[in-house]
Amino acid sequence: MVKGLYTAYTGMLNQQNRMDVLTNNLANSATVGFKKEGATTQAFDDVLAYHIKDQSNPTNVRHIGSLSLGAKVGENYTDFTQGAFQTTENPFDLALSGNGFFACEYTNKAGVTSVKYTRDGSFILNQSGDLVTKDGDYVLDANGRHIRLNPQQETVFNENGTITQNGVTVAALQIADFTDYNYLEHFGESYYQPVEGATRKQADAKVFSGYLEQSNVTVINEMVELISVTRNYETNQKVIQTIDGTLDIAANLSLIHI
């Protein structure tokens, strides 16, 4: 019966994790360039099969009867499917068609800078004429430098990432891509940062000016999934309440016999 409590408890933890992911997706359904996340679950038999095949620690022998029932919360993942484009007619609003990210220079509260990557191309010019994000982070060129433009001249962003003013090429956007997106992790609202093992590759994305890539979250699908997760959570909760009631009855019966 205690195993039943543990099984229901792990089920609640799993559903809570899925609920957190879904609510975050819904909260960012209107965030430009946001990529939805998903949650995975490992069943007991999958975990058992993994440990049976794992020979890294031969002294860790599990004898008959020492079963750990329940569900194991797996890793969360990001769905990098491209979102729909929305027309803005603002030349500094950029969208990427294909795989790739804009490179930006992020500065933390301590003043330390680092390169982050984003699909959010809602850029502006600051007072100095630098191309920056809506939060003021510098957009980087192909050489990792800030992009300074003349606000008095017409600016054209070409599909290959080059920037021209009055017909003269003045800079080129840094469009980065990676061989395996599993080595990218969320940072803040719309940034991604590579982790150890991430490798760069040539990006094949095209730049479209006057458009913004919307979130790839489908609100209806997320709501339906959230309802299902909520019901599963409540089911596990009722199992725990039932077992708790049964244990309480058993304890009272033992007192009567005493």
For the regions a protein language model found, what residue spans apply to each?
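Amphipathic alpha-helical polymerization modules
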Residues: 1-257
